[in-house]
Curated annotation (Swiss-Prot):
Function text: Produces a single-strand nick in a specific site of the plasmid, and this nick results in single-strand replication by rolling circle mechanism.
GO function terms (MF aspect): DNA binding
Gene name in the database record: rep
Annotated source species: Lactiplantibacillus plantarum (Lactobacillus plantarum)
GO process terms (BP): DNA replication
Residues annotated to bind DNA: Y229
Descriptive protein name: Protein rep
UniProt family annotation: Belongs to the Gram-positive plasmids replication protein type 1 family.
UniProtKB keywords: DNA replication, Plasmid
Family matches, as InterPro entries: Rep (IPR000989)
Amino acid sequence: MSEIFEDKTENGKVRPWRERKIENVRYAEYLAILEFKRAHDVRGCGEVLRFRKIGEHLKLYQTWFCHKRLCPLCNWRRSMKNSSQLKQIIAEAVAREPKGRFLFLTLTVKNAHSAEELKVSLRALTKAFNKLTRYKKVTKNLLGYLRSTEITVNEQDGSYNQHLHVLLFVKSSYFKNSNNYLAQAEWAKLWQKALKVDYEPVVHVQAVKANKRKGTDSLQASAEETAKYEVKSADYMTADDERNLVVIKNLEYALAGTRQISYGGLLKQIKQDLKLEDVENGDLVHVGDEDYTKEQMEAAEEVVAKWDFNKQNYFIW
């Protein structure tokens, strides 16, 4: 009998390959029902995983990922890569501007109730954010930023709550006096102006403590919030198949041609200087979780895991 495959992190936590692959297969089934052309390709995502075993650690070195925006397997790998890149960028930003401070900003708009409305709203969000970062009150202390889009689905009415999470890197002078500092109410007014809407949108801003390891105001928590999934699979993998089909169809339409993450200012420059690839279109095999030399990888034992569609698990091959 074949051995069940298990991949653990250095601290002993089991990586969720099985859970993500089960969701991936279900997602592929939904795409097939909706008659999307690539449904069969999606089903083959991460079917065979090839690892190198170095000590007790497994390092993925070969597989095929479908790169679909809503694929739970690809989304998991993407969030890992985003997180890894962001850690490198933040470390370099602090080294270059040691007096710089971080803010975590959440910018919202009214919910969208259809695929078309969501698509239009996502474009408006990006356009308004670009305007916001050009306002004099913002630019005078802004060093750089990372902006990411998140969409949640309302359980009651099925509407879409699209919002931006922004990690702002600002000069220390931002906190010095009222001429530089922007209170939450001022951020809300500027965001309303950028959006060109007749209602006051909900905005939340807080200073982030770079040296604090845990808590919602820690830099790590803010970085993780910014680098996480665009849409949680739980929002389109509910017990209600009919609802899931509607949500997936709407999201596939609305997200086409959009980007989840963008960098600006110093953080964008650092990303270029570090030669970090574009996560949205890039390699999801190497996500920056571990770095080994070519010699180490070539000398290591190979471990191959293959997905069994009937038993719904990976087995050592």
